[in-house]
């Protein structure tokens, strides 16, 4: 596994953080969490938006503004894009985050909302769909197995990821290297290197593919392809094979685009959002 700046590696995502508020009714108690903050915007059907690794909710700003008639719940993971890490500083990350978002859904009184997740957020969205918390799920440019995004498997890459995480967070040289990566990655400059390393470790050890047959909610998968036809065909085949276990899943390539499809192809991505939310 290389630590280069390939846009399709696990170290992806960007965007500015927005102001994080609880926007419930006047009698509602604030949602307090040491793992996430939530911004609520708009009125209408509920949609939960989860950004990717080292990203803030700002990645969704243009889309949220273009889609009135929905109440968007923008998740901001602590440790990413300017928020202090707090409970995300050490230990497992992905499963606790999924549990915390599920707790928010319950606390806010949401009834099986639509959930859209980009990159790492797509993994969290899938977990919420599998747990019955989401009414429908859109995954943006993420495979069921995080390691597969760099051509590995959870069994093969997981051990390496454990060692890599220890190196990046437990040695002076590793921390310097991770700091350099963070400094060079758009959207990650204000993210905590420890949280990024923990997220990479968790993602490399997660494979939700075997659980897809028990997913009972509608699933849309949007993925980025480049301008090279042969490469686009290979990526499309890879995604279709990875999601074959999800009966009725709708897969849509979008391109030419890099990993941040909402920025590279905003009009086409907005059209896919409309189709997903109208279902």
Please tell me what each predicted stretch does.
Residues 2-17:
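N-terminal secretory signal peptides and thylakoid transit peptides that target proteins
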Residues 73-113:
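Active-site loop/oxyanion-hole signature of alpha/beta-hydrolase fold enzymes
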Residues 113-148:
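Conserved hydrolase catalytic core segment
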Residues 137-166:
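Flexible "cap/lid" loop of the alpha/beta hydrolase fold
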Residues 153-155, 162-219:
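Conserved alpha/beta-hydrolase catalytic His-Asp/Glu region
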């Amino acid at each position: 596994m290389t630590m280069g700046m390939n846009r399709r590696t696990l170290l992806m995502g960007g965007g500015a953080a927005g102001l994080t508020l609880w926007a419930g009714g006047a009698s509602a108690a604030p949602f307090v969490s040491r793992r996430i903050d939530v911004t609520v915007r708009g009125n209408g059907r509920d949609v939960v938006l989860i950004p990717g690794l080292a990203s803030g909710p700002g990645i969704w700003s243009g889309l949220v503004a273009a889609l009135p008639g929905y109440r968007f719940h923008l998740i901001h993971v602590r440790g990413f894009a300017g928020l202090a890490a707090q409970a995300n500083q050490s230990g497992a990350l992905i499963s606790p985050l999924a549990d915390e978002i599920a707790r928010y859904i319950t606390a806010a009184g949401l009834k099986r909302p639509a959930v859209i997740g980009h990159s790492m957020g797509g993994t969290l969205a899938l977990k919420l769909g599998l747990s019955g918390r989401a009414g429908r799920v859109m995954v943006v440019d993420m495979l069921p197995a995080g390691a597969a995004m760099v051509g590995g498997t959870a069994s093969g890459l997981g051990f390496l990821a454990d060692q890599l995480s220890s190196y990046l967070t437990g040695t002076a040289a590793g921390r310097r290297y991770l700091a350099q990566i963070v400094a060079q990655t758009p959207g990650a400059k204000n993210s905590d290197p420890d949280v990024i390393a923990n997220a990479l470790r968790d993602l490399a050890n997660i494979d939700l593919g075997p659980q897809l047959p028990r997913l009972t909610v509608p699933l849309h998968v949007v993925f980025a392809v480049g301008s090279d036809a042969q490469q686009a065909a290979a990526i499309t085949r890879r995604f279709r094979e990875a999601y074959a276990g999800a009966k009725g899943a709708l897969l849509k390539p979008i391109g030419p685009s890099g990993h941040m499809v909402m920025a590279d192809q905003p009009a086409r991505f907005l059209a896919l959002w409309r189709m997903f939310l109208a279902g």
